[in-house]
C-alpha cells in the first residue's frame, strides 16, 4: 500500500472502516428462498406491454412530472387521507436514511436517538450509526411480541427522535398487538418523537396501521407510514414511499436528493399500479400457500418451533441452524440463517414463502438437512 493510499484511507471514518458491506449470497443455479421475493414473474402479455412503455421513455431527460403522477397513483392505491403528503425513495432503505438525516443533530453537542424493537430490520441501526444517531435496541419477548413495559421505559429514558415499528416485523413475521402498539405510539408522542410504521410486508398482513391513522388522526399525528413496492412484487424496481401528515413529510422531502427515482423505476411502478389486481391476486395466493407451508413445517420431525406468520416469510427453530443452512445450500436451496443476528434468534432460519413447487423443494431440502 502506498503512503498516499494509506493517507486517503485515513480520511474514511473509523467506524465505517470497521463495518462489513452488505453481502448478497450468490444465487446462480439455486432456488432463492432467502429474500422474501415474489416468486411469480409478470404474465407474458404484461411483460411485452411494460417493455413497450419503458422503451418509449426519454432516457436522455431527468425524471419530471411522471413522479407527481406516481405519487397520485400511490395515494389513490392506499387511500391516503386528506392532509397527508408523500416522499418517494429509491427503495425504503433510502427513506430510512432520509429520516435519520433529517433528525440527526450534527454540531449541536446533542445526539438524537433512534429506537426500535429487536430483532428487527438491520437498516435501522445501520442508518443510525451512519447518520450519527444513538440507536436504542429494545429486545422483544421470547415469543417475539412487543415488550411493552421495556418499550415504554426506554422511550421515557432516551426520548427518541424516531421510533420504528415494523408491522409486521422482519425477520419474525409477527404483527404486534394493536393496543400495545398504540400505547408505544402515545408514549413516543408524549416525548415529542416521530413513529414510523414500517409496512414493507403489508400485502401479506391481516391489518394495516393506516386504518388507525384514519380513525384517530390526532392521536397518530406524529406517525408516518412507510411502504415499499418490493413485496408488492417489484423487488427489482427500487421504490419506497413515506406518507403522513404534510407538515412532517414535507420536512423529510427537503433532504431527498433530486432525481432519486429514475424514469425507469417510476414508469414500472405506474405500470404495476395500473395492474394492481394481478399483484393482489399473487399476494392472496401466497397467503393461502403460507398456511399450507406452516402446517407442513409443524408436521416435520426435527423442527423445534414454527412461528405464525403475517408476512411472506416463516421463522423456524431447528436443532442446528448452521448445519441445516449448509445442508440446504448443498441441495441448491438458499434460505436465511438468522441464528447469529440476535440472541433471541438462536437456532433460527427464515424461510421465504414461495410457490407450491418452490416450497415443496425447500421442504425436501430442509428435511434432509436437519
From Swiss-Prot:
GO terms for molecular function: histidinol-phosphate transaminase activity; pyridoxal phosphate binding. The modification N6-(pyridoxal phosphate)lysine is found at residue 231. Its EC number is 2.6.1.9. Pathway: Amino-acid biosynthesis; L-histidine biosynthesis; L-histidine from 5-phospho-alpha-D-ribose 1-diphosphate: step 7/9. CDD domains: AAT_like. Keywords: Amino-acid biosynthesis, Aminotransferase, Histidine biosynthesis, Pyridoxal phosphate, Transferase. It comes from the Bacteria. InterPro entries: Aminotransferase_I/II_large, HisP_aminotrans, PyrdxlP-dep_Trfase, PyrdxlP-dep_Trfase_major, PyrdxlP-dep_Trfase_small. It catalyses: L-histidinol phosphate + 2-oxoglutarate = 3-(imidazol-4-yl)-2-oxopropyl phosphate + L-glutamate. Its cofactor is pyridoxal 5'-phosphate. One of its GO terms (biological process) is L-histidine biosynthetic process. Gene3D superfamilies: Aspartate Aminotransferase, domain 1 (3.90.1150.10), Type I PLP-dependent aspartate aminotransferase-like (Major domain) (3.40.640.10). Belongs to the class-II pyridoxal-phosphate-dependent aminotransferase family. Histidinol-phosphate aminotransferase subfamily. Homodimer. This is Histidinol-phosphate aminotransferase. It comes from Paracidovorax citrulli (strain AAC00-1).
Amino acid at each position: 500500500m502506498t503512503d498516499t493510499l494509506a493517507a486517503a484511507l485515513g480520511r474514511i471514518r473509523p467506524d465505517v472502516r470497521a463495518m462489513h458491506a452488505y453481502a448478497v449470497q450468490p444465487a446462480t443455479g439455486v432456488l432463492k428462498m432467502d429474500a422474501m421475493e415474489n416468486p411469480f414473474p409478470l404474465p407474458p402479455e404484461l411483460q411485452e406491454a411494460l417493455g413497450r412503455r419503458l422503451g418509449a421513455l426519454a432516457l436522455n431527460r431527468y425524471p419530471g412530472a411522471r413522479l407527481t403522477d406516481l405519487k397520485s397513483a400511490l395515494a389513490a392505491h392506499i387511500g391516503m387521507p386528506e392532509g397527508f403528503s408523500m416522499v418517494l425513495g429509491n427503495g425504503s432503505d433510502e427513506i430510512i436514511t432520509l429520516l435519520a438525516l433529517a433528525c440527526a443533530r450534527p454540531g449541536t453537542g446533542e445526539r438524537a436517538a433512534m429506537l426500535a424493537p429487536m430483532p428487527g430490520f438491520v437498516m435501522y441501526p445501520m442508518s443510525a450509526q451512519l447518520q450519527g444517531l444513538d440507536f436504542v435496541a429494545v429486545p422483544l419477548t421470547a415469543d417475539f411480541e412487543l415488550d411493552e413495559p421495556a418499550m415504554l421505559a426506554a422511550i421515557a429514558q432516551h426520548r427518541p427522535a424516531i421510533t420504528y415499528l415494523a408491522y409486521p416485523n422482519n425477520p419474525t413475521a409477527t404483527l404486534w398487538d394493536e393496543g400495545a402498539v398504540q400505547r408505544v405510539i402515545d408514549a413516543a408522542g408524549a416525548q415529542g418523537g416521530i413513529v414510523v410504521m414500517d409496512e414493507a410486508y403489508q400485502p401479506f398482513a391481516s391489518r394495516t396501521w393506516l386504518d388507525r391513522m384514519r380513525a384517530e388522526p390526532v392521536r397518530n399525528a406524529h406517525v408516518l407510514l412507510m411502504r415499499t413496492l418490493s413485496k408488492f412484487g417489484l423487488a427489482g424496481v427500487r421504490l419506497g414511499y413515506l406518507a403522513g401528515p404534510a407538515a412532517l413529510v414535507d420536512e423529510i422531502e427537503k433532504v431527498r436528493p433530486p432525481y432519486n427515482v429514475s424514469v425507469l423505476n417510476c414508469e414500472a411502478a405506474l405500470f404495476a399500479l395500473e395492474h394492481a389486481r394481478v399483484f393482489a391476486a399473487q399476494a392472496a395466493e401466497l397467503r393461502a400457500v403460507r398456511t399450507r407451508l406452516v402446517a407442513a413445517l409443524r408436521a416435520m420431525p426435527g423442527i423445534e418451533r414454527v412461528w405464525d406468520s403475517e408476512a411472506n416469510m416463516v421463522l423456524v427453530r431447528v436443532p442446528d441452524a448452521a448445519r441445516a443452512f449448509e445442508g440446504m445450500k448443498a441441495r441448491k436451496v438458499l434460505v436465511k440463517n438468522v441464528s447469529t443476528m440476535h440472541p433471541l434468534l438462536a437456532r433460527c432460519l427464515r424461510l421465504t414463502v414461495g410457490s407450491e413447487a418452490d416450497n415443496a423443494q425447500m421442504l425436501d431440502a430442509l428435511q434432509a438437512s436437519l
